[in-house]
Amino acid sequence: PLGTVQKIFSGETVNPRYDTLLALEHFFEEPLEVREHVYNRYERNGSYTVDDYRTLPDEQRGELIDGYFYDMASSTFGHQSIGGEIHRQIANFIVENGGNCRPFIAPVDVQLDCDEKTMVQPDVGIVCDSSKIQRFGVYGAPDFLVEVISPSTKKKDYTLKLSKYIEAGVREYWIVDYMQEKVLVYFFE
């Protein structure tokens, strides 16, 4: 159940049952219909930089995480609709309440760690520090991020991006699984 998973990831449950751990392990290791992959064919994988990322062809959508390229397939209609609606609701809320934060929707480049090894494209985000908004996109951790998962990005969104967002200083992260009709919300200090 989702409540159990949230308690485990939040640290509330320190010693989960063995069968729960096995179920989680199976979930994260199950074979997926992978349309996204790491660029294994490149010998330099792990040492790529933002400069390499910027040389990708315009039609090639991808992310650079810790020096590794991840190919990103184009979004489905459902995926894009959910992300668009979340963005619309957030933008309306900010305007109606006179807020100064700036919402954005993919594809926007986010140089998450302010280093040369990571550039991600979250589905939706909010930046409250206007100095982070640069000509190319966002430099530094946004305050709020949303990833709408698909079968090909599930593992990366639940694990790799979760840890990257925590380390970078993102304050709130939503994982939206519209196929399961679930939203997992993380609040970070």
Residue ranges and their predicted role:
Residues 1-7:
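Short alpha-helical DNA-recognition segment
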